[in-house]
Amino acid sequence: MIIRSPEPEVKILVDRDPVKTSFEEWARPGHFSRTIAKGPDTTTWIWNLHADAHDFDSHTSDLEEISRKVFSAHFGQLSIIFLWLSGMYFHGARFSNYEAWLSDPTHIGPSAQVVWPIVGQEILNGDVGGGFRGIQITSGFFQLWRASGITSELQLYCTAIGALVFAALMLFAGWFHYHKAAPKLAWFQDVESMLNHHLAGLLGLGSLSWAGHQVHVSLPINQFLNAGVDPKEIPLPHEFILNRDLLAQLYPSFAEGATPFFTLNWSKYADFLTFRGGLDPVTGGLWLTDIAHHHLAIAILFLIAGHMYRTNWGIGHGLKDILEAHKGPFTGQGHKGLYEILTTSWHAQLSLNLAMLGSLTIVVAHHMYSMPPYPYLATDYGTQLSLFTHHMWIGGFLIVGAAAHAAIFMVRDYDPTTRYNDLLDRVLRHRDAIISHLNWACIFLGFHSFGLYIHNDTMSALGRPQDMFSDTAIQLQPVFAQWIQNTHALAPGATAPGATASTSLTWGGGDLVAVGGKVALLPIPLGTADFLVHHIHAFTIHVTVLILLKGVLFARSSRLIPDKANLGFRFPCDGPGRGGTCQVSAWDHVFLGLFWMYNSISVVIFHFSWKMQSDVWGSVSDQGVVTHITGGNFAQSSITINGWLRDFLWAQASQVIQSYGSSLSAYGLFFLGAHFVWAFSLMFLFSGRGYWQELIESIVWAHNKLKVAPATQPRALSIIQGRAVGVTHYLLGGIATTWAFFLARIIAVG
């Protein structure tokens, strides 16, 4: 008789056919809500339909069902992303000058859009070089394609088709995992398993496969391109993968195969896994061999990290234990209870993820110019400016989203009866101290940062330059920042003995790198002007945080409205008969936070745009003399408000204002139109609902007179709807205005 250990029970983690697929139901507007499904009585119906369609919390209170809807929606989102990517690659294949750009990236601009002549719009097709006429693009796709080893438009076609297949696959997966095999709640809450798969699978194997692609395909192809070989002569990717001798000609260590790996003689691989630092002088981008090495190292770290958490085998960390062990001397119960919050409130989970992803996106913005990862990216000033601006805006929106979902968690998911003396409870109990101190910091920063500028404007107006804060009079040098720069500039040979150059040329020390007579990057000097504007950054960021954090900490209750939690996430006022209680909902804090986020990011991208044109970007003569686009005027001009208005906004707007009749005229029209969209927002923000309701009733009266009144009663927008429309147009108008201003300028002079 054989005694067996009991078989481990396999947990069934999916439900089969939980929701039937019904086109009839999908075709009924508002099928997710009993009230909305009845159809419209008033025009408010269409607003409620849009507001609640994706608010899954309002469709059901069953956490499992909500989780499944979110999970399924993620596949829909991925499908849209693949569709978008496919469109980008298709434009590269069908409408672009990619192959021409590849053969001469310093003299030919990237273009992937040719405008059809209908009523004269073909004026927009500017000459981008090499005899190609089209709209210059600034997305950085060409540089990315070159870095990944794409050498022909046929390869772009194939990738575009592949992305379409994946888009279809994702749509199918979204349907399948909601209607056919929907995961149970336990599956969504199994955090250790999720961590293992995401860390080892997505990040670990993802980085490893990218490192493999770089080593076997990108590096050899880029090696040939840098040497000036015609792209059509370069072997195709599969030839490098299948033929080891081909690679061994470029990287001798390939001849030895995996022997050095297993004999621990890893330094043999140093010909394609380097640790140089700095930029490749041919392309002005990071060394691609450094990047391959980086991805290999990252892959190893994440593969290890993906084996740290306890799943089926009973070994490893449990996240609940880690959190509950986290107790400081002053934090009471510490992180006890956080595990339950993060596994039952997807808003809390999303809030943390948005905060971290938003911060990471802003870090990406700063690395794209200081460590330009792709060949010929650094000398494409339009793309550099666009990538920085784009990632700053995205980061700002994500961080505001983090506050929004933190507040929704507080209102909908927070249970005060089970939370006592843990970290969150302690934060909430001393929220008055937090907010009043933060408010003081904002007032201090606001008066002092702005005061320095006002002082300078006044002294300048009175003709007393010797009494101004500037590099040539009263100096306020950013000594801490300069110390950090210096430390990094000295790091190679000290803290990083293998590296030949520092992580970024911007730190100082190194010479400039120029490609095709244009500056790619050089040490960025910091002075009084930067010190002043950095304190404006500190001010605007602190005010944004003040508004958002106050919204979160007072989302459930305040002295003014103790029962705020019962009123929900968004409400206009605390009912009739309680004056002075409007605009206090958590939603209103997000609304106000968006304006200050817009302020913060605007100052950052203005600072970046002017600083780079003044101190970095420009041309290099044969004698090595650098001529910057605005001739280094940042240090002396940006220290007064007047300087910002006169030498940045007005002086640099000349290109967009004078763009009519040229290939940049679309930016002139966008500049005008976006100003109009922005002004349109003020109509919603500075106007009361009653005004519009009265106006509508007069108009309805006229329709009744003529017997053309509709069955659906027109209603003025609610207060919340009006503010939502207002902030949307404010941001859309402001961002599009800035976009047109930046691009017309930098394409003309860059």
Swiss-Prot record:
Swiss-Prot/TrEMBL GO biological process terms: photosynthesis
UniProt keyword annotation of Transmembrane present: yes
Binding site for chlorophyll a': H675
Catalytically driven reaction(s): reduced [plastocyanin] + hnu + oxidized [2Fe-2S]-[ferredoxin] = oxidized [plastocyanin] + reduced [2Fe-2S]-[ferredoxin]
Residues given in the record as [4Fe-4S] cluster binding sites: C573, C582
EC number: 1.97.1.12
Residues reported in the UniProt entry to bind phylloquinone: W692
Annotated InterPro entries: PSI_PsaA, PSI_PsaA/B, PSI_PsaA/B_CS, PSI_PsaA/B_sf
Membrane disposition: Multi-pass membrane protein
Any GO MF annotation of the entry: electron transfer activity
Keywords carried by this UniProt record: 4Fe-4S, Chlorophyll, Chloroplast, Chromophore, Electron transport, Iron, Iron-sulfur, Magnesium, Membrane, Metal-binding, Oxidoreductase, Photosynthesis, Photosystem I, Plastid, Thylakoid, Transmembrane, Transmembrane helix, Transport
Sequence positions that bind chlorophyll a: M683, Y691
A cellular component term, taken from the record's GO annotations: chloroplast thylakoid membrane
Assembly behavior: The PsaA/B heterodimer binds the P700 chlorophyll special pair and subsequent electron acceptors. PSI consists of a core antenna complex that captures photons, and an electron transfer chain that converts photonic excitation into a charge separation. The eukaryotic PSI reaction center is composed of at least 11 subunits.
Known role: PsaA and PsaB bind P700, the primary electron donor of photosystem I (PSI), as well as the electron acceptors A0, A1 and FX. PSI is a plastocyanin-ferredoxin oxidoreductase, converting photonic excitation into a charge separation, which transfers an electron from the donor P700 chlorophyll pair to the spectroscopically characterized acceptors A0, A1, FX, FA and FB in turn. Oxidized P700 is reduced on the lumenal side of the thylakoid membrane by plastocyanin.
Protein name: Photosystem I P700 chlorophyll a apoprotein A1
Source organism of this protein record: Solanum tuberosum
Taxonomic path: Eukaryota, Viridiplantae, Streptophyta, Embryophyta, Tracheophyta
